[in-house]
Amino acid sequence: MTRNDPSRTIAAPTGTTLNAKSWQTEAPLRMLMNNLHPDVAERPQELVVYGGIGRAARDWESFDAIVETLKRLDDDQTLLVQSGKPVGVFRTHADAPRVLIANSNLVPRWANWDHFNELDKKGLAMYGQMTAGSWIYIGAQGIVQGTYETFVEMGRQHFGGDLTGKWLFTGGLGGMGGAQPLAAVMAGASCLAVECRKSSIDMRLRTGYLDTWTDNLDEALRLIDESCKAGTPKSVGLLGNVADVLAELLKRGVKPDLLTDQTSAHDPVNGYLPQGWTVEQWDDKRVSAPKEVEKAARASMANHIRAMLGFHALGVPTVDYGNNLRQMALEEGVENAFDFPGFVPAYIRPLFCRGIGPFRWAALSGDPEDIAKTDAKVKELIPDNPHLHRWLDMAAEKIKFQGLPARICWVGLGDRDRLGQAFNEMVANGELKAPVVIGRDHLDSGSVASPNRETEAMADGSDAVSDWPLLNALLNTASGATWVSLHHGGGVGMGFSQHAGMVIVCDGTEAAAKRIGRVLWNDPATGVMRHADAGYEIAIDCAKEKGLDLPGILG
């Protein structure tokens, strides 16, 4: 089992020459490879895409076997992938998924990091995060609009809709957290983001998500103060330990205007640098003494939350951004760790009630012009949404593509299927140079059960009910998605979430059009269904407006 191979450099093929038998199998092949592009993945030589140890394949032998299998797969066959390892090819039919993926799933009694890590060491499991093991990660852009929407809503609720002269403090510049600086600037706020790894800071600078960096707190605060006084938002990366820095700010009485965190706290061994440790010491001990790392990291997380609670008590809008930091602190004795809310119940849930979430697509041609054309098509088909148009304009101006050109665009039920059909038609008539794939984050309205994140504080108390992502995966399979995934532990770690993903190929064929119509209607409809069942009036009204047949919910 080879987990680390520095000789490997992976990039997705582009253009119209097929390496597999059809676009239905070429698409997952390219997206798997795209997940490991050097500008996309955090540690591609280790198959780690983002989120601590979120991998695209279990090991390099499994990666090679997946690639070779996809190349020979017929359009009436389905490949089964078990925790990043290809385990079977079965005859199905043309409208069935070409790939079905199950990652990191454990029987609930054993669903914890200790048991998972034992399996992982033996080569029997792989942590798939959300879009790492489901082959639809598109770099930091994949989370940037959701982060932007959150920051805009924070500005609306707390500052009258204007973040000019305000600044956000946060931690973590990895694959998810790396979106925060650009999202803050897009929303009109400056951002001070603390990151312990210089390589992560360098990647955000290289890919345009961060404006500048320093290793000196006083210099960082000077840069933030200058940008706020000038009313010109700027993002500053600070090399350091976020728990140390936040405690120092509290001690000095330096108050940010907004406060959150996106370190990989969900994984106390691989995701969070303990206070007083060097990165080199951490990297060594993660392998040689993981329990020592976990103990020290958890203690540091508790200190981190205590500092966040200190600012919360001072009236600073403070929000958990879904990394389970509060839970870790609670388990370390911080009894009031949940005094501040998670970002979904505080700012995002009304969108989920209408099936609105992180719709994304990638151009398999590799040509950025294909994304420009699809951006224009979105504006054409959704003409009366100036907020969406502003997002697309900002994205075109400010977001650098990582790997295959791609776009994230939060739209909901009734729009996703129309856009998918339009993209498919653009492929058919040659307007796009090659097919596109449409997918989404597992963080969506109907595809996840995560009581400390997406389903926190549900109106009916159904936070932990995980039937919903299972139904979502089953329905997307029945509807004909090109690949479907079912994962455990993404975002918040082992034992705290179950979630499903789907991707569908727009190859310009009539058969694809039928699948697209089913999948891109049914997928967001499950989110409306789930929230209507929980009693949200917005979701109930949306279900009625869209004519959903929900017999046990609407009566």
Curated annotation (Swiss-Prot):
Compartment(s) where it occurs, according to its Swiss-Prot or TrEMBL record: Cytoplasm
Cofactor(s) recorded in Swiss-Prot or TrEMBL: NAD(+)
Catalytic reaction(s) noted: 4-imidazolone-5-propanoate = trans-urocanate + H2O
Keywords: Cytoplasm, Histidine metabolism, Lyase, NAD
GO-annotated biological processes: L-histidine catabolic process to glutamate and formamide; L-histidine catabolic process to glutamate and formate
Pathway annotation from the record: Amino-acid degradation; L-histidine degradation into L-glutamate; N-formimidoyl-L-glutamate from L-histidine: step 2/3
Active site: C409
Positions with a binding annotation for NAD(+): 51-52, 129, 175-177, 195, 262-266, 272-273, 321, 491
GO cellular component: cytoplasm
Gene3D superfamilies referenced in this protein's UniProt entry, alphabetically: Urocanase like domains, Urocanase superfamily
Family (UniProt): Belongs to the urocanase family.
The protein's role, per its UniProt record: Catalyzes the conversion of urocanate to 4-imidazolone-5-propionate.
PANTHER family: UROCANATE HYDRATASE (PTHR12216:SF4)
Name listed for the protein in its UniProt record: Urocanate hydratase
The organism of origin for this protein: Stenotrophomonas maltophilia (strain R551-3)
Gene expressing this chain: hutU
